[in-house]
Swiss-Prot record:
It comes from Helicobacter pylori (strain HPAG1). The keyword Ribosomal protein does not apply. PANTHER family: RIBOSOME MATURATION FACTOR RIMP (PTHR33867:SF1). Belongs to the RimP family. This is Ribosome maturation factor RimP. It is found in: Cytoplasm. Its main location: cytoplasm.
Length: 146
């Protein structure tokens, strides 16, 4: 269902100048919550941006009626530290520092240099490039350095 929602709202969000990072539908305290997270290619995602996107996509979602039950719409920034789960997440996080854990228990920190639909390339501290298929990744998380 979230894939249908994503397909419906992605173009609208892009027409406003922002990028759709993720859509998730969760149940919290007996209430359905539809979370839409954004990336602003020109800087931070402000509260005004979240409100603007919410006001545009809310009526669209109501008309499409993808979610039968009542729900709360939450629009937010994708966040500074987040787990990368899909090729899209990797592509929208290029240039960021990440912590990588592989299925074989190897782990390292690197800069995410490139990503496609099958793998991601990481620049290690010695500037070597390590290419890893998504199937070999256990967890990849962005790191924010204070």
């Amino acid at each position: 269902m979230t894939k249908k929602i994503e397909e419906k709202i992605e173009g609208v969000i892009e027409s406003l100048g922002y990028l759709l990072y993720d859509v998730s539908l969760v149940k919290e305290n007996e209430q359905h919550v539809l979370r839409v997270s954004l990336k602003n290619p020109n800087g931070a995602v402000s509260l005004d941006i979240c409100q603007q996107v919410s006001e545009v996509i809310s009526p669209l979602l109501d008309v499409c009626d993808f979610i039968q039950d009542a729900y709360i719409l939450e629009v937010s920034s994708m966040g500074l530290e987040r787990t990368l789960k899909t090729p899209k997440h990797f592509k929208l996080s290029l240039g960021e520092k990440v912590e990588v854990k592989l299925i074989n228990k190897e782990s390292f920190q690197a800069v995410l240099k490139d990503a496609n639909d099958l793998s991601a390339d990481f620049e290690l501290e010695d500037h070597a490039i390590k290419s890893v298929g998504y199937k070999d990744l256990k967890k990849v998380k962005t790191l924010f350095e204070w």
